[in-house]
């Protein structure tokens, strides 16, 4: 592991957030991803590999502690995996919100509205807030924000 970052709503002071911690783990290039994935699954995490629509990332994986039989999460931690040479827009977005309280307030209000609208439908909730996230990530990139926290 090269680096670990806490990002997401719980990393932003005053932000409305579910009790979920998002952790970004940056892996060294030479790591064997199959071995890493096996270590995580042996520790009780579920591994989800997903394609990157932007084609800027590779080896995108998330790890979560499995849901219980009745569909309730046991723990609220998502571990996002990236290789060290991959862009990290989620860090730029979180940094921008920490530095711009007015944008953080607007995002918090949007999240609250969408949570009421979509309830436990995570996919629709994520899709509905994506325009906001993309807009402020672009602003962070244009403003020359640092790549890391």
List the model feature ranges, each with a label.
Residues 1-6, 10-18, 27-37, 41-149:
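Catalytic core of pol beta-like nucleotidyltransferases
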């Amino acid at each position: 592991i090269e680096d670990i970052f806490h990002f997401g709503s719980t990393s932003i002071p005053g932000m409305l957030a579910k009790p979920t911690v998002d952790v970004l783990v940056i892996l060294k290039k030479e790591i064997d991803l199959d071995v890493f994935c096996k270590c995580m699954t042996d520790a009780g995490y579920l591994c989800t590999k997903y394609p990157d629509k932007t084609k800027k990332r590779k080896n995108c994986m998330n790890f979560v502690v499995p849901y219980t039989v009745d569909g309730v999460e046991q723990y609220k931690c998502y571990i996002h995996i990236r290789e060290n040479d991959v862009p990290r827009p989620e860090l730029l977005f979180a940094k921008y919100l920490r530095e711009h309280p007015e944008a953080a307030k607007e995002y918090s209000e949007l999240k609250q509205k969408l949570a009421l609208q979509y309830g436990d439908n995570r996919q629709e909730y994520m899709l509905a807030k994506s325009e906001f996230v993309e807009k402020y990530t672009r602003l962070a990139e244009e403003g020359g924000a640092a790549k890391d926290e």
